[in-house]
Design a protein with these regions (language model features):
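Glycine- and small/polar-enriched repetitive beta-structure motifs of secreted/surface proteins
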Residues: 1-201
Length: 201
């Protein structure tokens, strides 16, 4: 049919079409939302009026705050759970892209990848990759904990950085732009600075 709902309080107050919601409070307050798929308790739920379109949320609280966002894919518990107006994001893994609200065109693959990100056009692949970036944009993180130090020296607000390797980039500026690091931890095979200079080690 035009709408398919299953679960306690699923899609309360929904008048939209083409939605599929399965699970307790999934799609709750969906209002005029259309063509969404929410599977899991609280998936694609919102506390206010929701007119979101073409989103997929799979997992407990996946995309739970969505309001007007479109074309997002959230898979995993609490993935994209703070996203409200963000569009065209892909987050796969528990708490991936969790704190994003209005960010667009981000890709986070791995548990807690880009967890704190609120910005745009970031790519993180690997568990915890780019986890601490909040306002930085156009970054690429490849590898487990890429750009992340467990205590203090994580990339936070820099943009246009490329970090490749397990915990790579620890010797770089937390807020620097256009940096390159290929290696493991603070050790690197190749490093680059904001002036596009590169060096070995």
């Amino acid at each position: 049919g035009r709408r398919a709902f299953l679960g306690c309080s699923t899609v309360a107050c929904n008048t939209g079409s083409g939605n599929i919601f399965l699970g307790e409070t999934a799609g709750c307050c969906a209002a005029t939302a259309c063509e969404n798929i929410g599977i899991g308790k609280g998936a694609l739920r919102t506390s206010g009026s929701n007119s979101a379109k073409n989103n997929i949320g799979i997992g407990v609280c996946a995309g739970r705050a969505i309001s007007t966002g479109e074309y997002n894919v959230f898979v995993g518990q609490c993935s994209g759970s703070f996203t409200t107006t963000g569009c065209s994001n892909v987050a796969v893994g528990e708490c991936s892209l969790c704190k994003n609200q209005g960010g667009i065109y981000n890709v986070a693959l791995g548990m807690r990848a880009l967890r704190m990100s609120c910005c745009h056009y970031n790519v993180a692949i690997g568990a915890e990759a780019g986890r601490c970036v909040d306002t930085g944009c156009f970054n690429i993180f490849l590898g487990t904990y890429a750009g992340v130090e467990l205590t203090t020296n994580s990339i936070t607000s820099g943009s246009c950085n490329i970090i490749i390797g397990c915990r790579a980039g620890l010797s770089l500026s937390q807020t620097g732009d256009r940096q390159l690091a290929i290696g493991i931890g603070a050790n690197g095979w190749i490093k680059g600075d904001s002036s596009y200079n590169t060096c070995l080690g």
